Amino acid sequence: MFQDNPLLAQLKQQLHSQTPRAEGVVKATEKGFGFLEVDAQKSYFIPPPQMKKVMHGDRIVAVIHTEKERESAEPEELIEPFLTRFVGKVQGKNDRLSIVPDHPLLKDAIPCRAARGVQHEFKEGDWAVAEMRRHPLKGDRSFYADLTQYITFADDHFVPWWVTLARHNLEKEAPNGVATEMLDEGLERQDLTALNFVTIDSASTEDMDDALYAEELADGRLQLTVAIADPTAWIAEGSKLDNAAKIRAFTNYLPGFNIPMLPRELSDDLCSLRANEVRPALACRMIIAADGTIDDDIAFFAATIESKAKLAYDNVSDWLENNGTWQPDNEGIAQQIRLLHRICLSRSEWRHHHALVFKDRPDYRFVLGEKGEVLDIVAEPRRIANRIVEESMIAANLCAARVLRDKLGFGIYNVHTGFDPANADALAALLKTHGLHVDAEEVLTLEGFCKLRRELDAQPSGFLDSRIRRFQSFAEISTEPGPHFGLGLEAYATWTSPIRKYGDMINHRLLKAVIKGEAIARPQEDITQQMAERRRLNRMAERDVGDWLYARFLNDKAGTNTRFAAEIIDVSRGGMRVRLVDNGAIAFIPAPFLHAVRDELVCSQENGTVQIKGETVYKVTDVIDVTIAEVRMETRSIIARPAA
């Protein structure tokens, strides 16, 4: 009788349209209930029974109920699931399997089975890649997943690496393929094998990209020749190896090992500028004045070189600082180090006055045992030899940026536009409260940005610098020449690491076209997107493996009185994040560890400060002593507390 009643349908429609609804993202808690976060200000309570229909991170539409003045959300429609493809640990065996996603806020096991075509017999503790197949908000009774790939067994010592690479869908090994002979590119190669080129790298480096040679001209100016490994002499555009490199976009450097962009035979041998081996190279010759200015007469050319020495950063630095026992093999090499040192000092001086110089931060190196255990974490400060190479590379990349811009009008450029124009007024207002007066328009120019950065660098602490970081835009990869505000340069195009960066290989091909006077097509925009995405994934992978290894390394310090110096890097409502100065580990200090009485405590992300009873007690960039309260291995998180 009621089945096709149009009035009833209309009434239903009316009720539906009158019921309040909200769209937002589900936030789970460890207590079973959750919240629907609509925006920064508004959230609705989701009771535990309703949480069974959703997962942390799902974007949903929910019906809003009001009972006794309390609002709650009932999930109704799934807009975007949080989990699609994920990694996790398998529970159970054979016919009754489930998988717990490897995520700090996802604790529930999801029933699953091996997907068709997956041969592995899964058992308790195995790590796997899974894909969600069912969701309660899609009309299914429950969540369900397919196991699409076996990663490794529970006790594999290398779980951090294999699980992380699988999570981000990144390659586990070097690409296959060989390059048997050099291509005929129609390039005249200058024979520079007699010159004293040297490479300076870490002692363990095998993929040497760059060799340097300096000489003093009769008028006292210095001439620098930067010779760069030449993989495009072996790899044709559009070939199988080229396409594999294009997908990888970068060599992936993880703690303990790397996954190269090119086959190891090329990256570590045929292309690597090994000592006493003749190698093809792409070279740039520039003349540097006493004040560090690079002459306009820049020459790019193809060459053949033979590195005369594989030098290590620490040895060269020790020698220049009159420390240690290491000596250059002969006077020719010693003379090179002295000249390169002079170039470094004059270029550094020029950049201090006319561009910007990053503050030196140490690199942290994990020392690993045979079984992936962390034996030590060593802070490696950036020393004078690192700076020699850095100044030479920045100069060479500046030269490439100019030549590609002037001769072609395009290339693969690293572009950074400083501050987002939408933030300029807020930035000026913030600086004003700290006694720095800037013009909101001027600060958007390269000149104005550099001026502000120099003023910030002259401040007694980095606190103000940390406050304005959120107003900055991100660096981008672009085919269009543009300024790099972060470096304080009018344009910047890298070509000095073609063994490990695909964008540098593209710039090599463009520079070769310039050398030959040939026309060449502008690179496609999609390649810059692929490079940006891969750079993001590689960084996340490096961070994830690092978190795992830090947790392993500090696990035995939990609950002890061992003190660590730690720099405060961020303040949030829930507490503050710190970086341990000696090893680079990131730890979290929950607000209750800062002060027991919550009402007397104000943690302000906006101001980067922690106030107790109205007094600022901690602020971002402060260095404090902490102890490790707890290490949660399942989430790889380190909880610290201020040392008593």
From Swiss-Prot:
GO terms of molecular function: exoribonuclease II activity; RNA binding
Every S1 motif domain range: 561-643
Ranges where the RNB domain occurs: 189-516
UniProt enzyme class: hydrolase
Catalytic activities: Exonucleolytic cleavage in the 3'- to 5'-direction to yield nucleoside 5'-phosphates
Keywords: Cytoplasm, Exonuclease, Hydrolase, Nuclease, RNA-binding
Enzyme Commission number: 3.1.13.1
Main location: cytoplasm
Subcellular locations according to the entry: Cytoplasm
Gene3D superfamilies in UniProt: 2.40.50.640, Nucleic acid-binding proteins
InterPro entries named among the record's database cross-references: CSD, NA-bd_OB-fold, RNase_B_OB_dom, RNase_II, RNase_II/R, RNase_II/R_CS, RNase_II/RNase_R, RNR_Ribonuclease
Gene Ontology biological process terms in this record: mRNA catabolic process
Gene Ontology cellular-component annotations: cytosol
Family: Belongs to the RNR ribonuclease family. RNase II subfamily.
Function: Involved in mRNA degradation. Hydrolyzes single-stranded polyribonucleotides processively in the 3' to 5' direction.
Record's protein name: Exoribonuclease 2
Top-level taxonomy: Bacteria, Pseudomonadati, Pseudomonadota, Gammaproteobacteria, Enterobacterales
The encoding gene: rnb
